Amino acid sequence: MSLVPIVVEQTNRGERAYDIFSRLLKDRIVFLGDEINDTTASLVIAQMLFLEAEDPDKDIWLYINSPGGSITAGLAIYDTMQYIKPDVVTLCVGMAASMAAFLLAAGAKGKRFALPNSEIMIHQPWGGMQGQATDIKIHAERLLRLRDKLERILSENTGQPLEKIKADMERDYFMTAEEAKTYGIIDDILVRHKK
């Protein structure tokens, strides 16, 4: 059972209670704070599409604290970030690992951030399969195609040579916020809230 705090706002028409995520959405903040799967991807995508419809010219902030997860769910979020008109500002608060690091790097250029004690990790996609040899081969080939796609996009978003991305993603590659900035995953480290 997860607990979601409720906040109460005073307005000229009285009090209004919101769950914390709805309140953040009013400020154009989408929070990705869980494993990336089809459910979390659908929620993030729906919020981005809603915010685009509300104001297509105003930035959307995507706060990320996630261990990563499904490649296809992550690519659905990535494609939506590229598709919508507003810039998506990304901010790592805590951890952005695997697919979450990929999304962090996919924010609008100049608008990708991390808090000082954030940790970022990239690695190659992994998966498991059992069954007939031909089915295992099909899934292995698919995984290699996805890996190639992720490496190319990450190279484009970070400015790192493709060969360096390939080498660094061979194993878990952990970075501090400062190292992620040098690497090109983020553009700056936020110490104080920028208004």
Swiss-Prot record:
PROSITE patterns: CLP_PROTEASE_HIS, CLP_PROTEASE_SER. The keyword Protease applies. Disulfide bonds: none annotated. It holds the Pfam family CLP_protease. Its EC number is 3.4.21.92. Cleaves peptides in various proteins in a process that requires ATP hydrolysis. Has a chymotrypsin-like activity. Plays a major role in the degradation of misfolded proteins. This is ATP-dependent Clp protease proteolytic subunit.
